[in-house]
């Protein structure tokens, strides 16, 4: 299980192992079938590759273990998405820019290349497709986070819905959305629907 948390530190700050950058140990096991009120223990780190407009490299993620059930959780800084190398904030901002500016995908990629040299069409198309595939999960999470996210009236077609979703998240602030969505649903908004949280 991965739990997102707010942080004022940058990705660069997580490029070395430092416990002070992570929240303190949870006081209760987060797994529903355990949920024992016992302080979890530090259980080392794991490394993952992370790409953003400001950082490209390895970061370290703190792990904790439940002394009762033996399962681990990882504390994920808010700018990380579970199972994605690219920054969740950058993904939201890139897609928002694509839908808002109405520029071609080719032009958008040209603009992104100085900051994200490895990004290409397939990344952006994959992110667009995944959001559409996750529409029901995303809408469910948004409705739980805040009632004003409930779309009233007829169900808009996918592209219009994606644009509206990205506009609202961009106004709310991507950091807040990423952490709140993860805490509310136990998943990333980009999680594969075949995965169990």
Question: Where are the regions a protein language model picked out?
Answer:
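Generic alpha-helical secondary structure signal
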Residues: 13, 18, 49-50, 102, ...
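Short, conserved DNA-binding cores of transcription-related domains
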Residues: 1-81
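Short, positively charged, Gly/Tyr-enriched micro-motifs
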Residues: 70-161
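Long C-terminal interaction/binding lobes of large macromolecular proteins
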Residues: 1-11, 124, 136-197
């Amino acid at each position: 299980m991965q739990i997102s948390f707010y942080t004022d530190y940058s990705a660069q700050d997580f490029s070395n192992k430092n416990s002070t950058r992570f929240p303190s140990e949870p006081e209760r096991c987060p797994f529903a079938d355990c949920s024992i009120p016992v302080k979890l223990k530090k259980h080392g780190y794991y490394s993952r590759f992370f790409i953003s407009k400001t950082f490209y490299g390895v970061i370290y993620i703190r792990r904790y273990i439940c002394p009762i059930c033996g399962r681990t959780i990882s504390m994920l800084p808010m700018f990380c998405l579970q199972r994605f190398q690219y920054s969740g904030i950058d993904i939201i901002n890139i897609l928002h820019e694509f839908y808002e500016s109405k520029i071609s995908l080719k032009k958008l990629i040209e603009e992104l290349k100085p900051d994200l040299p490895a990004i290409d069409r397939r990344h952006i198309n994959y992110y667009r497709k995944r959001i559409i595939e996750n529409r029901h999960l995303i809408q469910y999470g948004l409705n739980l986070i805040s009632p004003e996210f409930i779309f009233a009236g007829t169900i808009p077609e996918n592209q219009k819905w994606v644009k509206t979703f990205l506009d609202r998240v961009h106004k709310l602030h991507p950091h807040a959305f990423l952490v709140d969505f993860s805490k509310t649903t136990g998943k990333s908004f980009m999680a594969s629907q075949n995965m169990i949280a």
